[in-house]
Amino acid sequence: MKMKLPPFIELYRALIATPSISAADSALDQSNEALINLLAGWFADLGFRVEIQPVPDTRHKFNLLASIGENENGEGHGGLLLAGHTDTVPYDEGRWTRDPFTLTEHDHKLYGLGTADMKGFFAFILDAVRDIDASKLTKPLYILATADEETTMAGARYFAANTQLRPDFAIIGEPTSLQPVRAHKGHISNAIRITGQSGHSSDPARGVNAIDLMHESITQLMALRTTLQERYHNPAFTIPYPTMNFGHINGGDAANRICACCELHMDIRPLPGLTLSDLNELMTEALEPVSQRWPGRLSIDELHPPIPGYECPTDHHMVGVIEKLLGERTAVVNYCTEAPFIQQVCPTLVLGPGSINQAHQPDEFIDMAFIEPTRELIGQLVDHFCQQK
């Protein structure tokens, strides 16, 4: 028997009031268990079958998979997957003028941490499906709530690697202002570490200056940057080639001492189609002259787990379906989402309420003008992909 859910705004309020920050810093990182349990209770009240999945190698993080419209054995074919992440970024208390964990309505906007990015999306889903009749679904509806999108994307990675589900289509409800997104660049971030040999600067030959070796390495990487710009091109992107950025460098401790260690932090944002393995090979090849000349003194280490580029082809029939429903052409963006991993399960678009411009900002908000169009859109998606009788 179905239980009655709270009104939409109260669902939203409860989600925002349940902290679920993910951060590389363990002092800031929080479990999302309370939020997952909250969602699990609500979806169970609506008659969904609910599965909570611990995510390995995390600090007590969980995914949730809720499903309805499957057969008695919990099986189904095709259907729709609506996905989103349960975590938020940390907040800067000094820059917020409101309590981040209290939903505040002002000037037709809802303020709070996660209102746009993107805990609020689950309130939209729950509100849209509260009256769903499972007996009228000919294909299943799945809801996926993941962990740690803002850091390692561990939840989406784990789900994609272990699920047997194969829905017809997935929507990730990141804030796109309800414009469908079909592609984005990937992201890799590496530390280039040089180990030299310290010594007195009066006799440079008695040491190995790590800064000199880093200079050689950066020269090689800049040549690779040019190669990437010349070899890879996608005119759909505002910046139509892979980018490489040198973001942080540190080395040495005194002007009169040969530098023993130097470290560079850099990132590359590859286009869809440029695989992570290809990119690693290009990096290794670019730095090989330095490695050969100075054996054992150069290393490349990941700063964060890499994210591949993502693309759903423009001619995929699902793209046409969504464009027709919305009357909007699909777009490409420069930020990253869980789409490369969900795309391993089924064709995927990124589409949700709110603006990316409010994500990761003090006084994060979502414009209430998105409420009715989003509710209507989710209903249309369920009708189309789950084929209500």
Curated annotation (Swiss-Prot):
Keywords: Amino-acid biosynthesis, Arginine biosynthesis, Cobalt, Cytoplasm, Hydrolase, Metal-binding, Zinc
Domain of life: Bacteria
GO terms (BP aspect): L-arginine biosynthetic process
Pfam families associated with the record: M20_dimer, Peptidase_M20
Catalytic residues identified in the record: D87, E149
UniProt: Zn(2+) 1 binding residues: H85, D117, E174
Catalytic activity: N(2)-acetyl-L-ornithine + H2O = L-ornithine + acetate
EC number: 3.5.1.16
NCBIfam families the record matches: AcOrn-deacetyl, PRK05111.1
HAMAP family on file: ArgE (MF_01108)
Protein name (record): Acetylornithine deacetylase
Species name: Yersinia pestis
